[in-house]
Design a protein with these regions (language model features):
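Polysaccharide-binding and catalytic clefts of secreted carbohydrate-active enzymes
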Residues: 92-294, 300
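Conserved, mostly hydrophobic/aromatic
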Residues: 5, 25, 33, 61, ...
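Short, acidic/polar
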Residues: 12-27, 125-131, 257-271, 331-339, ...
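The substrate-binding groove and active-site-proximal loops of carbohydrate-active enzymes
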Residues: 3-14, 36-52, 106-126, 151, ...
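A conserved amphipathic helix/loop scaffold
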Residues: 459, 467-693
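Hydrophobic targeting/anchoring helices
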Residues: 246-435, 522-527, 534, 540-542, ...
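A short, well-structured beta->alpha microelement
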Residues: 437-457
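Aromatic-lined substrate-binding rim segments of carbohydrate-active enzymes
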Residues: 18-27, 31-101, 130-133, 224, ...
């Protein structure tokens, strides 16, 4: 288990602090430092690579028994890039050259720089990456590489990019690969193009969906390919060390805005396939991320990693702030929750941002774990305590795996692309996913995330949820139909897969659910809340956007949950060996706004009906976040207590279990009574229980 801090973003901190800082970092219980190796800094003169400051830092790290993560920051380009590669500027959607500048939080180097589809820029970048790998491949304390920081490539472009001739040519090549020919494209898009030169990217939202969705899809593909390219360049030289990349958030959380497309930084599922793992940044106080959301966030990364390395590549070190605005302080209790939650979710490398407060630009005076705020000394003390516990239990933690989930929540990039093509944001789609994930966490029902182009091994699930999945491809539809017919339970919301991958609307009789005898009757005006009856209980549920009741057809519902006037609004349908729960509106979005306990109860009932097996059932009144897993044949329970609840009571699914657990944080021993556990937190509102053998 590697726990560490980001330390150096050249040229800060200055050399006078290095030696003592590295001693303090090791004394704080941390074992790793991360260094930003900036292309613009290292190759400030074309063809001359100066690693002297990094060499000194790597040497000091080894002296203090610290491992090193090197972040190859190729996206901060040299100031000379446009002189050496004329015409390499990115082009925005209005045909204007993008003027690159020094980035707002980095002291030297251009952003966004030259377009990486330009062969000249790519060749220069390759030389930098190769130089980094050759220089440090034999470094004895090198832990690994973070190949692409927050997957950034269009920061400070100030507009949607890139529309340069190289990128547009690659876009057309992408379409040729997908559709085979112009005739194939015309058939899919219902067009009459006669020349590929006429096929252009989508320019703006609220225009025809087909080219806008295809362009966004290409931009994601392009980022995936660039990440794989960076990996191949480095892997050709360094055959040993772990190489990952990380986004500012998981790809599910990247819904786009006026200057960015959704998922334009790449799709974590594809990025992880092309590397040794994947990671993400998390600043919980800054962005008001609580235990439940943090756990879901890291599970998104875990799901995409698919058994590969999971890195918490930037975890909030100290108080955040931008410019003259401050956010809340980071207490040691909060920070330790994130650390142990990350471990509970399967992370094997956790790096805090950063050691000292920043000193440049908008981030000045903030973010330091060892920063100048009132909690700094307490954070260091708490980190030292945890570092000792992690070291003493290193084998246990290194071999830990979270429990597998039997509930899958579907992420459909096509639905994100469709939403952005209309509204310039896919936030509604993101919030729908977040809503269902949160409701399941609140009932301690383990869930994970599946991506619509990576639907392998669906038989591991008993229950799959499609939150606001309005666009879907045929291959995904076929796999979901097989899942239901083979005994799975599928939950769908309004107008599920109403649009195809080209953004063309399909009438209800043309949608894949019609093959199961489930057909919507059309859109109705929104009325909210809606009254449900489930298991003899009446529930009041908020919904969103519109109502789409279901027509009465060949497949009569096995159970009706809600009606709109005389029409069926929500029902369960028997389909083959499985079933479909069809909801005629968007309920996850409404839940995320209100956290209505009736929605949580509905999801609890649906999971139980689907025979989802649970490791434990929580018996306390207030929500206690618990994550379960195992290591070396022993069950582990990570428990995160709120201030309002001092005692955790839960029932294991091992009714006859009368063994015991040790809380490795406090040393407390807890005895089970026929599968029932009751215990308190004796350490910072946390408990990490390990089954005794």
């Amino acid at each position: 288990m590697n726990t560490g801090v980001q330390y150096y973003r050249a040229p800060f901190p200055e050399m006078e602090y290095w030696e003592q800082d590295f001693k303090n970092i090791r004394n704080a219980g941390l074992n790793t430092v991360q260094l930003w190796v900036l292309w613009g800094w290292v190759e400030s003169t074309p063809g001359k690579f100066d690693f002297s400051d990094y060499d000194r830092l790597v040497e000091l790290a080894e002296k203090n028994n610290l491992q090193v993560v090197l972040s190859s920051i190729a996206e901060i380009q040299p100031m000379w890039i446009h002189r050496e590669v004329p015409g390499s500027e990115m082009i925005d959607r209005f045909g204007k050259k993008v003027i690159s500048t020094i980035r707002h939080e980095c002291n030297f180097g251009l952003t966004p720089g030259g377009c990486t589809d330009n062969p000249g820029v790519q060749e220069r970048m390759k030389l930098f990456l190769e130089s980094c790998a050759k220089h440090y491949v034999d470094c004895p304390n090198l832990h690994g590489w973070d190949l692409w920081n927050e997957l950034r490539w269009n920061i400070q472009a100030d507009e949607l990019v890139c529309f340069c001739p190289h990128t547009i040519e690659e876009f057309r090549n992408f379409l040729k690969q997908r559709y085979g020919s112009l005739d194939g494209l015309n058939e899919a898009w219902k067009r009459r193009y006669i020349d590929w030169q006429d096929v252009m990217p989508g320019k703006a939202p609220d225009r025809p969906y087909s080219e806008m969705m295809a362009w966004q899809d290409f931009i994601t593909y392009r980022a995936n390919a660039h990440g794989a390219w960076r990996y191949s360049v480095m892997r050709n030289i360094d055959k040993v060390h772990t190489m990952t990349a990380h986004g500012a958030s998981p790809s599910i959380g990247y819904s786009g805005d006026q200057q960015t497309y959704p998922i334009d930084r790449g799709n974590d599922w594809e990025l992880a396939k092309g590397m040794d793992g994947i990671g993400c940044s998390s600043f919980p106080v800054w962005f008001n991320i609580d235990d439940a959301e943090f756990g879901s966030r890291i599970e998104m990364v875990n799901a995409a990693a698919n058994g590969k390395h999971i890195w918490l590549s930037e975890l909030q070190g100290g108080r955040a702030g931008i410019g003259f605005d401050l956010t809340g302080e980071v207490s040691p209790e909060q920070q330790q929750r994130w650390l142990w939650n990350g471990i509970a979710c399967g992370a094997d490398t956790i790096l805090f941002w950063c050691w000292r407060d920043e000193v440049f630009g908008r981030e000045s005076g903030n973010f330091g774990l060892y920063g100048n705020d009132e909690y700094s000394a307490e954070r260091i003390k708490a980190m030292s305590e945890s570092g000792k516990i992690i070291s003493e239990n290193s084998s246990l933690i290194d071999n830990y795996k979270p429990d597998s989930a039997q509930v899958g929540i579907l992420f459909s990039p096509d639905s994100y692309y469709l939403a952005w093509a209309q509204e310039g944001s896919a936030l509604k789609m993101q919030k729908a996913i977040d809503g269902y994930a949160r409701a399941l966490v609140k009932h301690s029902i383990a869930s994970t995330f599946i991506e619509s182009e990576h639907l392998e091994n669906l038989d591991r699930f008993k229950f799959i949820i499609l939150p606001r999945v309005v666009a879907l491809g045929k291959e995904a539809e076929e796999k979901l139909l097989s899942f239901v017919e083979n005994g799975g339970t599928l939950l769908v919301e309004s107008e599920c897969a109403a649009f195809d991958k080209a953004g063309l609307y399909r009438y209800p009789e043309k949608r894949f659910l019609n093959r199961l005898g489930i057909r919507e009757a059309g859109r109705r005006q929104l009325i909210t809340p809606v009254e449900f009856t489930i298991g003899g209980k009446t529930l009041s549920l908020g919904c969103d956007q519109w109502l789409t009741p279901f027509a009465i057809g060949e497949n009569a519902p096995a159970e009706v949950f809600a009606r709109y006037k005389n029409e069926i609004l929500a029902a369960r349908y028997s389909c083959g060996k499985g079933s479909v729960i069809a909801l005629g509106s968007y309920f996850g979005n409404s839940y995320l706004e209100t956290e209505n306990s009736d929605f949580e109860q509905m999801m609890y009932s649906f999971a139980a009906e689907a025979k989802v097996e649970r490791t434990f059932e929580m018996l306390t009144n207030d929500f206690i976040y618990v994550k379960s897993g195992s290591s070396e044949g022993r069950q582990m329970l990570f428990c995160f207590f709120p201030d309002s609840e001092k005692v955790c009571r839960l029932r294991l699914n091992r009714a006859d279990f009368n063994g015991s657990y040790t809380d490795i944080l406090s040393g407390n021993i807890i005895k089970a009574d026929n599968g029932f556990l009751e215990f308190k937190s004796l350490h910072r509102n946390l408990a990490v229980l390990v089954e005794n053998k």
